[in-house]
Amino acid sequence: HDIVKLIPTGWQYPEDTCVQIILEGKEYKTDNFKETPWRQTAEILVNGEPKGILEVSYLQEKPAKDEGPFYLEERTLIDVLAKFLGEMIELKVAKKIE
């Protein structure tokens, strides 16, 4: 999915940012994705049920900010993106039912 390629542009260090979305057992990730200790996650809910995780990580250690190396605005952004992904799935499911 192209969305994983767009997400890093919203973070302070886009060139050092990688993303993984795990949604209903499927993984979508940036080409540079790897597990690191410098990460934020947000649960993806579909109709109130947990269906996946959005993870944004830095590839290298960064200076401490509000939440580890991340700003509060980045926490807000990851939460909004996870909510958006959940709502898109809900819409897709609703259209299939029609």
Regions found by a protein language model. Give the residues of each.
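The cytosolic transmitter module of two-component sensor histidine kinases
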Residues: H1, Y71-E74
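Helix-loop-beta substructure at the N-terminus of cytosolic sensory domains
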Residues: H1-T30
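A generic structural motif
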Residues: K34-E35, S57
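A short beta-strand signature within small-molecule sensing/ligand-binding domains used
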Residues: E35-I44
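Short hydrophobic/glycine-rich mini-motifs in sensory/regulatory modules
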Residues: I44-Q60
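Sensory coupling linkers of modular signal transduction proteins
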Residues: E61-L72
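Sensory-domain boundary/capping and coupling elements
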Residues: P69, V93-E98
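Signal-transmission/dimerization alpha-helices at domain junctions
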Residues: T76-K95
